[in-house]
Amino acid sequence: MSSEFLAELRWEDGFAIPVANEENKTLEEQLSKLQDERSSMQDQLRDYEDRINAMTSHFKNVKQEFLFTQSLCKARDHEIESEEHFKMIAERELGRVKDEIQRLENEITSIREKKNDKENSIFKTTQKLDGLKCQMNWDQQALEAWLEESAHKDSDALTLQKYAQQDDNKIRALTLQLERLTVECNQRRKVLDNEFAETLSVQLELDKAAQDFRKIHNERQKLILQWESTIEQMQKRDKDIDNCAVALARIKQEIREKENLVKEKIKFLENEIGNNTEYEKKISVADRKVLKCRTEYQRHEANRIQLKDELDSLKATVNRSSSDLEALRKNISKVKMDINEETARLGKIKNHNQIVRKKLKEITEKTMSVEEKATNLEDMLREEERGVKEVEVQLNIVKDVLFKKVQELQTETMKEKALVSEIEGTRSSLKHLNHQLHKLDFETLQQQEIMYAQDFYIQQVERRMSRLKGDINSEEKQALEAKTVELQKTLEEKKSALCLLETQIKKLHNDLYFTKKSNSKYRDEKQSLMTKINELTLFNDRSEKELTKAKALKQDLMIEDNLLKLEVKRTRELLHSKAEEVLSLEKRKQQLHTAMEERTEEIKVHKTMLASQIRYVDQERQNVSAEFHERLSKIDKLKNRYEILTVVMLPPEGEEEKTQAYYVIKQALVNNQMEKTGRSYEEEYSFVPMRIYDLVNQVQEINAWCCMSVPRSFQKVTPSSAEYEVKIQLEEQKRAVDEKYRYKQRQIRELQEDIQSMENTLTVIEHLTNNVKEKVTEKQAYVLQLNRETEEQKPKLERVTKQCAKLTKEVRLLKDTKDETLEEQDIKLREVKQLHKIIDEMIVDITQENAEIGVILQTYFQQSGLELPTTSTKGSRHSSRSPSQTSLLSARSSKSTSTSASQTSIKVLELNFPASPLTGSTSRPTSASSASSTGKSRKTNK
């Protein structure tokens, strides 16, 4: 600097250089001190201005937050008012429902009283009819005495006619009154139905209004929650802005401090730039070679992976085809075994029928007359032929069902193959696409590195050209400053755009969540409506059934009325004939004989009618019991399957039972934690490039300043110098920053991949849980349907049991016995054997479906000293029927009663399975055999 200045002044070398005096030196020192004070004061002024701006912005944010909190408080007050209103509406609805329940209970009590009155009247009329029948069954002596008295009193006949006419008039009046009452009842029922429909419509309207109010209330709550979340976000952002302002002031101070250090070290940096360029050229050549090698390696690796995937897919197809072939073979063998078992069963049944026929012939020849033998044999033959036909029909149905199931299995296997092939194809295509993506990412990184190298080289060339030309770099500096300002503006715009996009994404997520909620609500409403429709259809079916029953009862009453009228007419004719033929005793005897013959014929007809009714009732009872046993077996199978599922899904020992919601919540918490860590890494990563960019700008400014003020020094720097050590430290810092930057990038990628995998697993778990929920709902609906059917069948079963009890009483009266007959014992034994057979089949099916339950059942049966039934025991049970039935049909009653009593005693076996999660109260106390046996014992007691 001094040499240049002297050259400009044309100072000769021989003369001494002029130096400032002491006054000038003091002035220069004062000037430098004042300049330092001025710079420090300017720095303080800038700091104060920044603080003032930060405080003003903070004050604005506080005001806005205060307004938001006030509006939130108002919204909360409105919400509390709406909640209170909603509570009042619910209380009113509850009161209305209680009144309705009370009204229904009163109606039920009144209907019960009416029913009791009707039953009492029916009982009284039956007693009267029994009295009339007893009066009709007079002895012959009483008739003769009455005839002798009637011969003396002819006027009694006229009085009887008068009474009969009066009875007819009364009957007509009663029938008219009954018709009038039925018309009134129908009218009242119509009025009641109309009122019921009106109340239902009003109730539906009220329900709709309540639902609309609930929807509006929920929407308002959602808006308030959104509002709260926005306020929280704004508060967080305000805090972040404050922190950023403090950090910015601190960074500015640090920058000012570092600027002084950087100015001193620029000279050393410029000397080393040339060496760095040469080394960078060499490094770029080596990097290109490495990139070529990497690309070749990746290409070979991709080919290897593709070939491996193809090999795996071929292996999977081979394994699948072999498993399908084995499954088809197993199905064919199973079908053949079933056909052989059914044929053997049919042969055993035929042999059993022949043995029973022989035994029946022997017994009937001993005990019955010729006519009764013929009728009974014909009836037995018809029943046996009917049973054989039913067995054949069942065999055909089973064969058709088996054929259909085989066809369905084949179609399902074909579908499964197609789906597996599609999945494998999509997997291979996915792998190929992922490989292409990695390849493209790698290529982009290579291109970016090349671009950076080229840009750096261009900048160096431009600097050299400018230095060679000798241009002043003030314009470049201004241009760079303008560029920095523009870039900062663009950066702020992009930041604002990013914030807007994030808010829009959050809003879209919230909208998506609300739409999903509304869809689920609509589905629930649809399900509730469907259940209501089903209940209405069931109500209609029940009402139709009750109507048919009422019609049948009315027809029976009409028939009984007609029979009574016929009997009355016959008695009148007898009275008239006997009154006219009092004198001739022979005619009287003949008339009595004819009356006795008619009476015996009527008794015979009545007996035949009773026998036919007994047969019909027996058939109905057998059908009802068969249906009831089938449904019980279905329910037990479903319960067993459900218990197996719950056992499989139970947690291991020592751990608490975890529900599906627990896993969903756990997954959501993990996702939230991963998202938070990802955001923190992204924030750190966003600050790193900004710092690098600032450092690059600073270096460029330093270079420009060096070009302006300081001439380039051509002296070489020694390794022992301080500048060389500073350069090494700066290079180490740069390397550390680069390594941190790469490490953070790698962590961000790993976190993104982890988040993606967790989201995929979450979707899979949600899909599985939805499938399980659908299955559970289907099973629950099926169980409810079965329960309804059983409840509908209960009254039928009670009626049938009552009819059976009446018929057994009549049969015992006919046979003059109070003990159980052989037929009753035979029926009970057959029922018990049928029940044993159903239980054995259920146990065999369960053991075939699940081997673990088979092992558990084996242990329980061994503990109780019983044998576990297998497929072989099914056939043996059929063969063991014939000797038991022949022993029952033998003539020795004492032995038959003892065998029936021994066979009806069923051994109860307790199976303590683990508790199911849905019931949760107790484990299943007894097996299906014990439950069904207790049910049978109750029937027999009735």
UniProtKB/Swiss-Prot annotation:
The keyword Transport does not apply. The modification Phosphoserine is found at residues 894, 902. Belongs to the CCDC39 family. Residues 16-124, 164-424, 457-605, 729-768, 796-826 form a coiled coil. It is found in: Cytoplasm, Cytoskeleton, Cilium axoneme. The gene is CCDC39. InterPro entries: CCDC39 (IPR033290). The keyword Metal-binding does not apply. GO terms for biological process: axonemal dynein complex assembly; cilium-dependent cell motility; epithelial cilium movement involved in determination of left/right asymmetry; inner dynein arm assembly. One of its GO terms (cellular component) is axoneme. Residues 881-905, 919-935 have a biased composition (Low complexity). This is Coiled-coil domain-containing protein 39.
